[in-house]
Amino acid sequence: MDTDNRAMSGSVPTAFFCGQKKGITMRNQRVVLLVEIAIFAALGYILDLIGFGMPQGGSVTFVLVPIILIAFRRGIVAGVVTGFLIGLLQVVTGRFYPAPLSFEIVVIQVGIDYFIAFMVAGLAGLLRPAYMKAFENHNKKKMAIAIVIGALIASFLRYLAHVLSGILFFGEFAEGENVILYSLIYNSTYMIPVFLFAAFICAILFVKAPRLLMPNS
């Protein structure tokens, strides 16, 4: 009986410290995740400053690259949160250009163009399982395909958000005109290059440093 009691008494602190260690590890992982999201959001904000404007309007920047990378590295939620933070940084630093419309329309436009447009780009993470499987099988072709499709999803969903915002904007000034068609064409002129650049850069990063997309790297 004494032997059993000693064994039990010895196992209690062991279990306690193991549980404590596990809790600390989980907290550390959450902290690391939050730090990564903050870094990628800041990088996205900076990359949005780098690019070139199109003659008819709109800018071609590299803002989608960090969102796509964090979505592949950490998943959809991390990508969506990163997109939200990028939009928030643009708004609080005054890097948004609302249309001269009613307050309600401006709020909706800002919400769509500077929050939803970047948040939905985080859905590029839908291709993360396919990428991880290809990585485990050392199939570089399928890895590249997953990256490109992820970039396409991010770009297309952002494009749709800007199209919707454009319909609201142009609809206020062009009554009777085909504002849907105009918004579709206008936003495609800069979003197509945005997709091509994002897909190319992400694919290059994957070739040069595939472990960049591994959360334990």
Predicted features and spans:
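Residue-level signature of the transmembrane alpha-helical core
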Residues: 38-42, 65, 80, 84, ...
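Membrane-interfacial segments
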Residues: 51, 55, 93, 97, ...
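Alpha-helical transmembrane segments and their cytosolic interface
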Residues: 4, 13, 20-38, 130, ...
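Short helix-perturbing small/polar motifs within transmembrane alpha-helices
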Residues: 26-27, 31-46, 100-162, 166
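Hydrophobic transmembrane alpha-helices
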Residues: 19-81
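Alpha-helical transmembrane segments and their lipid-water interface positions
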Residues: 82, 86, 93-97, 116-124, ...
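Non-cytosolic membrane-interface motifs at loop->transmembrane helix junctions
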Residues: 57-64, 102-111, 181-186
